[in-house]
From Swiss-Prot:
Its EC number is 2.3.3.16. Pathway: Carbohydrate metabolism; tricarboxylic acid cycle; isocitrate from oxaloacetate: step 1/2. It is an enzyme of class 2 (transferase). The keyword DNA damage does not apply. Belongs to the citrate synthase family. Keywords: Transferase, Tricarboxylic acid cycle. GO terms for cellular component: cytoplasm. The lineage of its organism: Bacteria, Pseudomonadati, Pseudomonadota, Alphaproteobacteria, Rickettsiales. The gene is gltA. One of its GO terms (biological process) is tricarboxylic acid cycle. One of its GO terms (molecular function) is citrate (Si)-synthase activity. The active site is at H311, D370. This is Citrate synthase. It comes from Rickettsia slovaca (strain 13-B). It catalyses: oxaloacetate + acetyl-CoA + H2O = citrate + CoA + H(+).
Amino acid sequence: MTNENNNDSEFAELKIRGKIFKLPILKASIGEDVIDISRVSAEADCFTYDPGFMSTASCQSTITYIDGDKGILRHRGYDIKDLAEKSDFLEVAYLLIYGELPSGEQYNNFTKQVAHHSLVNERLHYLFQTFCSSSHPMAIMLAAVGSLSAFYPDLLNFKEADYELTAIRMIAKIPTIAAMSYKYSIGQPFIYPDNSLDFTENFLHMMFATPCTKYTVNPIIKNALNKIFILHADHEQNASTSTVRIAGSSGANPFACISTGIASLWGPAHGGANEAVINMLKEIGSSEYIPKYIAKAKDKNDPFRLMGFGHRVYKNYDPRAAVLKETCKEVLKELGQLDNNPLLQIAIELEAIALKDEYFIERKLYPNVDFYSGIIYKAMGIPSQMFTVLFAIARTVGWMAQWKEMHEDPEQKISRPRQLYTGYVHREYKGIRER
């Protein structure tokens, strides 16, 4: 991938053991420029050290831009707030995958294709039956998505012509598998997709309908879930997206790649944070105890952590959190819980107190996307073990867009991070009787 804004006349100088190396500065279209260190190891006989890759750009991308200091998130140049308020999830999916918003005809064709591919092979039901009833839905979904490669053996050796159809299949089937995982975990029959419903309605239908009870989708709930899906669709090179790219760099089939993303997302520091927020609000219990827990959060010797505040990238108010705060109020008002939902009251007061506290101001700890999403899910009747599953439904769009972009990038190679070795230099082996 070539950045047209790169200027080969700009260099950074790096001095190593008395020798100066000139490193090209690659110009970003917006945001931070990047120093190209790709030749340092070959020319200077050393590597760079960056735990957590916080100062490392692993790729060039045109999909998502974040300015953490200003609280900006854009997909293909469009502000996330505009997309959340004016677009719908499948339109954003099209934007991420193809790079442009669709025309009316393109949108209709895309949504029809997604609906057409929402069914999964009937034999997948046997896989679900191998899990015990107490299995976490994420465990079931992780296995089910990985198993899709068995049903599409032609994609074990995929070609460029397969990229778009693969993305559509994945976007279509993930909600079906997610709903099946939930239904199995609670012992209810699976509900098949209904192609007369749109993407979000269909998922709610598969989640909450039963063979003997039709589920009527509340438009406020549908709109809220649509926003949540959009807000979680992509977020640049985070842990799960990087995992998908690393797996994809080896040439692994797309179903295997997405399953690695799901595994990474399952980690409590990544996709499980909104569930942790709910547990924290329950632990606080009442607004009167907020000062006590604020003090605990400041005490470095106290294990308590204020969940839903702070972000590895954002040093300002997370723009997704601002949308979700208002969405949360809309949902609770519709459900008659706006004035009597204890979790919301604690959350609002906790946010207000924290944003005025110098400790949090100095450390730039603002509410993030996880702070209000769990409250919305809980009000919708979605159990906490499904929170990360819904995150995976939304993020699959970003994963597939990033996977497609990676394979279209001629500069990409198989990922191979290096290390700073600090172990033993050399030891002689001794037999077990001599140790």
